[in-house]
Every structure is written in structure tokens, then in C-alpha cells.
Amino acid sequence: MHILKKPDLSDPKMRAKLAKGMGHNYYGEPAWPNDLLYIFPVVILGTIACVVGLAVLDPAMLADKADPFATPLEILPEWYLYPVFQILRVVPNKLLGIALQTLVPLGLMLVPFIESFNKFQNPFRRPVAMTVFLFGTFTTIYLGIGAAMPIDKSLTLGLF
């Protein structure tokens, strides 16, 4: 209600304050034309100059031409897909590998219901959620490291 209420201009105290400039932003410098006309274009042109300068000084090198007949021995996905790739690569039945990947979001959706009795926000006071988080983090890191290795060393990470 206070936002929509208009000032009472018939009040002499209010008119005296407005006459002195109170109630308005009378300090600093105005945005037009100082900021919008002078400072913003300088910043925009400076940014463009930096980008063009970096592109000229350090151009991106062109790679070799694509050769469809020379494929690498093992094609790896992007780094963020390594754990999923490792599951599909190691599990013998591909349908089971896809089922394992659908269990991950289902398991994450069950965590709040498993620990619904515990209303604490401190993660150290929520043992089930903390255990699921740590297990998932370590499993994801383990699978990601294993995906970057050859298939015979991927499960043991070459340690034994």
C-alpha cells in the first residue's frame, strides 16, 4: 500500500521538503547523458577491442582435415559423460546398463523421503543424505577415472 500511495501535495510540510529537493535523488551525477552517452560506449568499445586484439594476437589454429577412414582406437565422449560411458562399457548387458542409469535419479528422488524424519539443515546432522552424497561423489569420480583407461584396467584403475 505504501508503494502505491501518492504524496499529499496539499500538505505544506511535504511541499517545503520537495522545494528543498528532499525526496528526490539530488546527489551524484545524472545517468543521462554522463553514463549512457559517454561511459557505456567506452566500455563496450574497450571490450570489443580486447576481444579483437586477443583474436589477432593469438588466433585459433586450424586442425587437420577430417579423415573418416582414420579413426582413433577408442573414441571417448566429453569428460562429463565419462561415468555414464564407463557404466555402459563395463556392464555386459546394455539393457542392464541403461537400467542402472535410470536408478540414479530414482535413488536421488528417494533420499528426502528416506530421511523425512530429520528436519535439520546442517548436512552433518543428516547422515543418510550425507552418506548417499559421498557414495555418489566417490562412485562418479571412480567411474570417470576408469573411463579414461583401457577396458582391461578400467575396473581396478590399474592398481591391482
UniProtKB/Swiss-Prot annotation:
Any idea which GO molecular function terms this record carries?
Answer: electron transporter, transferring electrons within cytochrome b6/f complex of photosystem II activity; electron transporter, transferring electrons within the cyclic electron transport pathway of photosynthesis activity; ubiquinol-cytochrome-c reductase activity
The disulfide bridges present are none
Extract the InterPro entries matched here: Cyt_b/b6_C, Cyt_b/b6_C_sf, Cyt_b6/f_cplx_suIV, Cytochrome_b_C_euk/bac
- Transmembrane regions: 36-56, 95-115, 128-148
Q: Which CDD domains match?
A: cytochrome_b_C
Q: Which GO terms describe its biological process?
A: photosynthetic electron transport chain
The record, for Gene3D superfamilies, names: plastocyanin oxidoreductase, Single helix bin
- Bilayer disposition of the protein: Multi-pass membrane protein
Task: Output a single Gene Ontology CC term carried by this record.
Answer: plasma membrane-derived thylakoid membrane
Q: Where in the cell is it found?
A: Cellular thylakoid membrane
| Highest taxon of the lineage | Bacteria
Record key words, sorted: Electron transport, Membrane, Photosynthesis, Thylakoid, Transmembrane, Transmembrane helix, Transport
Assigned protein family: Belongs to the cytochrome b family. PetD subfamily.
NCBIfam families tied to this protein: cytb6_f_IV (TIGR01156)
Entry function: Component of the cytochrome b6-f complex, which mediates electron transfer between photosystem II (PSII) and photosystem I (PSI), cyclic electron flow around PSI, and state transitions.
User: Which PANTHER family does the record cross-reference, listed alphabetically?
Assistant: CYTOCHROME B, CYTOCHROME B_B6 C-TERMINAL REGION PROFILE DOMAIN-CONTAINING PROTEIN
Its name, as the record gives it, is Cytochrome b6-f complex subunit 4
Per the record, the gene is petD
